[in-house]
């Protein structure tokens, strides 16, 4: 759904790799910092100019902007496995920080985390391999929980399709490791 008055697109996908309940949804919200000058939906193999909502399977949204050459349009994106409202709540986590501020905060966290181990070796290739492997090992498990409107930790259960209290983690990172 395109919401022009809020420079926003909301929706969900049911795409998954199997083994999840029927109510599985990955809800998303995208908010842009410029108004739309063009909007359309895509569905049934056609582009419907001016329409703001599509409900069939395999649909999409198209938006356009009036920009000057080189002007950047920023998009703020959040998702939730719980609800569209929760996706909106998750978007608030970004606050008013810019893309560059968020990227720098991420770099600082990774530098601090990777810097906990010091490797002494003059071979740049070995250092690069070690820190690349350390980085990948720290990507997992992934957090699969969210904070609700009351600040409580909740998660969508891929086992029964319910929203339950507490933490949940997923993806060990070793699913494609063979012995």
Predicted regions and their residues:
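Beta-sandwich/jelly-roll carbohydrate-recognition scaffolds of carbohydrate-active enzymes
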Residues: 1-171
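Aromatic-rich carbohydrate-recognition surfaces in CAZymes
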Residues: 170-179
């Amino acid at each position: 759904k395109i919401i022009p008055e809020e420079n926003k697109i909301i929706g969900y996908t049911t795409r998954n790799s199997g083994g999840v309940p029927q109510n599985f949804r990955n809800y998303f919200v995208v908010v842009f910092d410029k108004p739309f000058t063009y909007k359309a939906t895509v569905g049934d193999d056609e582009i419907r100019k001016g329409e703001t909502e599509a409900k069939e399977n395999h649909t999409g949204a198209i938006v356009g902007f009036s920009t000057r050459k080189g002007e950047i349009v920023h998009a703020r994106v959040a998702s939730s496995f719980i609800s569209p409202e929760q996706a909106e709540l998750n978007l608030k986590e970004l606050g008013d920080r810019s893309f560059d501020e968020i990227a720098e905060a991420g770099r600082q966290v990774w530098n601090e985390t990777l810097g906990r181990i010091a490797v002494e070796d003059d071979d740049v290739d070995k250092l690069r391999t070690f820190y690349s492997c350390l980085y990948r090992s720290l990507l997992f498990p992934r957090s699969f929980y969210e904070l609700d409107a009351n600040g409580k930790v909740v998660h969508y259960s891929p086992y029964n399709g319910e929203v339950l209290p507490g933490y949940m983690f997923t993806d060990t990172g070793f699913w494609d490791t063979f012995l």
